[in-house]
Curated annotation (Swiss-Prot):
Gene field: rpl21e
Name of this chain's protein: Large ribosomal subunit protein eL21
GO CC annotations, alphabetized: ribonucleoprotein complex; ribosome
Keywords: Ribonucleoprotein, Ribosomal protein
Pfam families: Ribosomal_L21e
Entry's family note: Belongs to the eukaryotic ribosomal protein eL21 family.
Record-linked PROSITE patterns: RIBOSOMAL_L21E
Originating organism: Saccharolobus islandicus (strain L.S.2.15 / Lassen #1)
Biased composition (Basic residues): 1-18
Any one GO MF annotation of this record: structural constituent of ribosome
Recorded superkingdom: Archaea
PANTHER family: 60S RIBOSOMAL PROTEIN L21
């Protein structure tokens, strides 16, 4: 038997899918232009149409804290289990925690 591959985006079919209404839409400028400050809380909301700066699917929906900036991307500290992880995410995949409603 041949072993099946376990790529970076396995088991993400429903997680990284847009609804038919949103399909083809690029991220809004208001979402791209938001400037986060250190200490701001953000929700990681992956936009599947933007591949650059996309975090792994395990971080989808997690709340993290901005701890810095690297180029256009942000360094976000996320608690995963009992560990503190620092991931690099571009603003297309972030929503501020207060406005996530």
């Amino acid at each position: 038997m041949v072993k099946h591959s376990r790529g970076y985006r396995t088991r993400s079919r429903s997680l990284l899918r847009k609804s038919p209404r949103e399909r083809g839409a690029v991220p809004s400028l208001s979402r791209l232009m938001v400037e986060y400050k250190e200490g701001d809380k953000v929700v990681i909301k992956i936009n599947p149409s933007v591949h650059s700066g996309m975090p792994h699917r395990r971080y989808q929906g997690k709340v993290g804290k901005i701890i810095g900036k690297r180029g256009r991307a942000y360094l976000v500290s996320v608690t995963l289990g009992d560990k503190e992880k620092v991931i690099i995410v571009r603003p297309e995949h972030l929503v501020s925690f207060s406005s996530s409603g």
